[in-house]
Amino acid sequence: VFVSGAAGAVGSLVGQIAKAMGAARVIGSAGTPEKVQRLLELGFDAAFNYRDAPVRDQLKAAAHGNGIDVYFDNVGGEHLEAALAELNVGGRVALCGAISQYNATDATPAPRNLALAIGKQLTLRGFLVGGQRQHAAEFAGRMAAWLADGTVTYDETVVDGLENAPQAFMDLLDGANTGKMLVRI
């Protein structure tokens, strides 16, 4: 399993849930050495700083050349292209976010290698929590147990004062947070 934006609130939980549900190997990408270290502390088998080298090269190395079967996409862009290249036949992609495009002022190109999805028989599916209500009770039960026994933990970045909310939002878009960004009022 490869999770992009893995040090964020969603990505960090996705990686831990994948491990809790038996994923053989979980790989995460993040934007600072500290976030990479945090992913390893959370139980990710491998993590890399996407700023250090091309994402595809780092992903291939982290997967030991065996490819990946599942990609949870929080980022889009170069991460999605790298994942498409490294996904094995029959691989699955959950499209949850595209943070690489959130601040873009120009139209962003589609993945240049999207045609790989045909030959590899990939499944790409949009993911919204609200679209998964039928799993809410099961998820709540499992998550409560995982939180109680420490299988899953979470991080929060807390900013004090409503007057600091605009900067907190900008910091969120710039990836300055680890885990959930909260404004305490």
Task: Show the residue positions of the predicted features.
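Short, well-ordered alpha-helical microsegments
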Residues: 11, 36, 56, 80-81, ...
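Mid-domain Rossmann-like dinucleotide-binding core that forms the NAD(H)/NADP(H) cofactor-binding site
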Residues: 1-53
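C-terminal hydrophobic helical "lid"/dimerization subdomain
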Residues: 130-185
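Local beta-strand N-terminus motif with an aromatic residue
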Residues: 44, 67-68
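Redox-cofactor binding/interface segments in oxidoreductases and associated redox assembly factors
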Residues: 3, 49, 72-73, 95
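Glycine-rich phosphate-binding loop and adjacent beta-alpha segment
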Residues: 39, 78-152
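Short amphipathic alpha-helix with an adjacent loop that forms part of the alpha/beta core around
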Residues: 54-66
